[in-house]
Amino acid sequence: MEDILGEWKRSHYCGNLTKADVGREVILMGWILRRRDHGGLIFADLRDREGLAQIVFDPAKNTDAHHKAEAIRNEYVVAVKGEVIPRPEGTVNSAMKTGEVEVLVTECKILNRSKALPFTLDDYVDVAENIRLKYRYLDLRRPVLQQNLILRSMVAQITRQYLSENGFLEIETPFLTKSTPEGARDFLVPSRINQGNFYALPQSPQIFKQILMISGFDRYFQIVRCFRDEDLRADRQPEFTQIDCEMSFIDREDIISVMEGLIAKIFTVAKGVDVPLPMPRMTYAEAIRRFGVDNPDVRFGLELVELTDIVKGAGFKVFADVAASGGIIKGLNAKGCARFSRKEIDDLTEFAKIYGAKGLAYVKIEEGQWHSPIAKFFSAEEIATMNQAFGAEDGDLLLFVADKPKVVNDSLGKLRNHLAGILGLADKNTFRFVWITDFPLLEWDEDEKRWAAVHHPFTAPMDEDLEKVESDPGSCRAKAYDLVLNGNEIGGGSIRIHQQHVQSLMFSMLGLSDDETRAKFGFLLDALECGTPPHGGIAFGMDRLIMLLTGSDSIRDVIAFPKTQKGACLMSEAPSPVDAKQLRELALKVTVKQ
């Protein structure tokens, strides 16, 4: 029979006891992590969200409490009353925040019992993720996940305080909205009242926050849930959280300045890390040239080296043919990696092939000489020129890819990050930010044979590029900007189109007919004709930001109830079938693909 809490009130969290509390009577409540019977004295670690406290049951002090302790098992919920005392000499546990003190229990209440658990709730016990997700209510008791979610809550509070102090209004936008093409698939919600019609869960509040600017709210923010029905990976979820912001009567510099202040405050308060401001910037073109990707990790070097002009006239036919057909040749210098075995180099080659490379040429530099199957195709002068371009020294490993520009940049850019992981160059406790600016406005979709928006259809072109959107769309740049942290895009934004004729032109460039545009975006086009101010904004991926702040390997470790990579909640068993009555009310019939 469990005890009743009665009039007991918790006086302290377990993890907050210090030497300053010695001599005080305290009431603690929590879960028993472990119990140890020393043949008289019984010790237990009591856990709550703030940490652990060691509690001691001494039969010489209180037989009733000691009798209760004999019945206690792991994960029992208990409340104890007792005196905080210093630990005896030689028993101080410096690994515990409360390791200098313990609580000598005078009264104990067993509030609830626990059956044997499927896994131990110690952080250091390795448990398969599917088991952890099935028993998420247990997994969330583990200190590492509790600390992750406590930090997440802190970041939300810092965000609200900072943005409110800077004149932003927190305004909610609808979850049940209209399906519009924004890149990924929508989650659709059937309407019972308007049968045959569907709502869509928002992929972002993009259009609504722009309409709020048209409505005169000037500065908006929201910590908002968004939904995308897309294939998942370690840093993606079907439902995710954004710190969403929009501002009127501003330019790019205004947005960047305010948002740098937000990120700096988050890192200072939540992590104790000072972020130098202003943050570095580079254009999209520079990022691709130097790093091969538009989200470069600038914690380390390994920059790509452009070699096309050096090798296009050389005797190595593979390189010469690629250059002659409009391709490029780039390389990177893996400093000190000439020690890599042939198998290790083969593994790097296979990795590069994942991103389209047909192969990976390599050169080991030892005793001032090139050691490579391709060395014989280059003159001493060409080798010297390449060595200079690479900054090559004895012990280095030079890696080359020759192909179409996109393949070269993708494969070497990803290989660069892969090598940094192998070489231990990417320290999780080092934080390096960079803004990427001047993105292309449009990119050609080879599969659909049409232009597609690089960011989204509401991004404004650079003023000087507006006149060539129709005549030369591939050369137009966008007023777009991403914030990248340690190779992860944590925020993306842009100045928006605020003139109706420009927005109509953009929809036309994306292949939408006038009828399609009116059907999908008519309300926005009408609003744009009613006095729309210049405006822009940004959205930060909160899940990814918290993942980086905590050093977690997956955003599933910073979300209370995440989905698997198949979009399932193993705990609640969602998604699940619904009964026939619900389907009839919605005028729906389910057919299953064979």
From Swiss-Prot:
It is an enzyme of class 6 (ligase). GO terms for biological process: aspartyl-tRNA aminoacylation. L-aspartate binds at E182, R228, H455, R496. Its main location: cytoplasm. One of its GO terms (cellular component) is cytoplasm. The keyword Nucleotide-binding applies. ATP binds at R228, D229, E230, Q237, E489, G541, M542, D543, R544. The record marks H38, G90 as: Important for tRNA non-discrimination. It catalyses: tRNA(Asx) + L-aspartate + ATP = L-aspartyl-tRNA(Asx) + AMP + diphosphate. The keyword Transcription regulation does not apply. InterPro entries: Aa-tRNA-synt_II, aa-tRNA-synth_II, aa-tRNA-synth_II/BPL/LPL, Asp-tRNA-ligase_1, Asp-tRNA-ligase_1_N, Asp/Asn-tRNA-synth_IIb, AspRS_core, GAD-like_sf. Residues 206-209 are annotated as: Aspartate. One of its GO terms (molecular function) is ATP binding. It is found in: Cytoplasm. CDD domains: AspRS_core, EcAspRS_like_N. Gene3D superfamilies: Bira Bifunctional Protein, Domain 2, GAD-like domain, Nucleic acid-binding proteins. Its EC number is 6.1.1.23. It comes from the Bacteria. Pfam families: GAD, tRNA-synt_2, tRNA_anti-codon. PROSITE patterns: AA_TRNA_LIGASE_II (PS50862). Keywords: Aminoacyl-tRNA synthetase, ATP-binding, Cytoplasm, Ligase, Nucleotide-binding, Protein biosynthesis. Belongs to the class-II aminoacyl-tRNA synthetase family. Type 1 subfamily. Aspartyl-tRNA synthetase with relaxed tRNA specificity since it is able to aspartylate not only its cognate tRNA(Asp) but also tRNA(Asn). Reaction proceeds in two steps: L-aspartate is first activated by ATP to form Asp-AMP and then transferred to the acceptor end of tRNA(Asp/Asn). This is Aspartate--tRNA(Asp/Asn) ligase. It comes from Geobacter metallireducens (strain ATCC 53774 / DSM 7210 / GS-15). The lineage of its organism: Bacteria, Pseudomonadati, Thermodesulfobacteriota, Desulfuromonadia, Geobacterales.
